[in-house]
């Protein structure tokens, strides 16, 4: 069975891992980094992904960041005259991760386990699965990030019974899960979170502070200047990271904008104490889901054996201090918070292929599921934190006499009224025989698969007629749309590969021109004019082809010149060999002459003991 890669598709950074020899291993990207920024940029039709896209984000308005925050919504971003959905942008990132995983493994990769925040609803999970499909990946399983982290942490501890709390503060989402580990079973007891809270928000409080301080000093609002704002964002992110290790950091942004008197610079010292003051509300916000998760699991903080921190933002000292205070436990720092989720996803891939034995993963649904009933009430069929896969049925009836159709309004959430919860979908069961209200028996069944994706069925018990849907959100893509996007993604991948080949061929051609010039210089006076002319003509022809940019022409001219250069190089080696031989012969002759000049001398051995007497 081919390898299944594990992908942590993050808001700010993504990571890919694979199981090798029973051990999960992070695959480094082309730049040698173990995580890749989740950033996509478009420039004159060319796509850039990762660090290269992030670096030019200040000057390129067609740069898309933190798209994960929009998954499962109808958000679209217009770039160079084309609208892109969050699924398509995520697919570009996934394609990039897939390509360098293939480069590392030396084989095609078609299957993946992708992680999502535990608190992602059905629409967000479905959108992630669609992104994988567009990228040419068969998504074998969608698993929750905290669960993946627990897998990576607990794989070598399966013989111990432990209750662990996973605190996962990523770039744009926040989750807490309580899990029980024992006998190879990873059972999620509860999960809670906030999909609109993450490291980006910690950056934002620093940005707001810088904007306010600069306005106070210079009377100019930098938040209205797009380019200045991007520089502020980069500086804020760096300052946040610095303050995890030092107590104060200098923020210096020369020529941030211009005033009446000329250019203005931003110079400011930010202390850790000030940063903690600015972000205190955010840290406190993370404590609510921690308490909720413990309550749902029916546990007190003292019953938690270990606290695991996941996500780069957990390096913030105030965050570590808050979780320590809340749970009374020193957070475990034995796992890399940036990589642990991808490692766990790779382990789950190994469970699917059978490479990892005796490990069972029992996940839960993060939100309650149900339907709207009379009076706009939300009637729950499946309570949150129910272990998945699961199914549940309940019988309902009509609300009016002679009602021949019922609307099934499927919802996800925790609020008592339907209007306050998230609509997953609607469908209709028709042709119900007319009868007084309350007589028809309508069975509504909910099924949640192992990926947390919902199927709903409604059946008229009297006629046996049924209607069912796999929930697609309002932003959900149809199969045709996905198919179209898959084709576009493949075409783009081909175009990207062609562009890469073009660059490589041009580089090789440029190198060959340089080699030719150097070889001709080294052979000056040692080869006849005709050979020199032949080489120069071929070199000029290749230069002209490079100027024109016709790939096939460059290849042909490069091959011609290559043959000539090989002949010249052979000649160069022959010349060098002749010279070396001549030197050797000259050296041997000189040694012989030196021998002829040697004079034999008589000598007498002196005995030290005799000398001393």
Swiss-Prot record:
Keyword Phosphoprotein: yes
Alphabetical keyword list: ATP-binding, Chaperone, Nucleotide-binding, Phosphoprotein, Stress response
Modified residues (Phosphothreonine): 173
Domain of life according to the entry: Bacteria
Keyword ATP-binding: yes
Region spans: Disordered: 577-613
Pfam families xrefs: HSP70
Induction trigger: By stress conditions e.g. heat shock.
GO molecular function terms attached to this record: ATP binding; ATP-dependent protein folding chaperone; unfolded protein binding
Regions of compositional bias (Acidic residues) in chain numbering: 597-613
Alphabetical list of InterPro entries matching this protein: ATPase_NBD, Chaperone_DnaK, Heat_shock_70_CS, HSP70_C_sf, HSP70_peptide-bd_sf, Hsp_70_fam
Family membership noted in the UniProt record: Belongs to the heat shock protein 70 family.
Functional note: Acts as a chaperone.
NCBIfam families: PRK00290.1, prok_dnaK
Protein name from the UniProt record: Chaperone protein DnaK
Organism for this UniProt entry: Bacillus pumilus (strain SAFR-032)
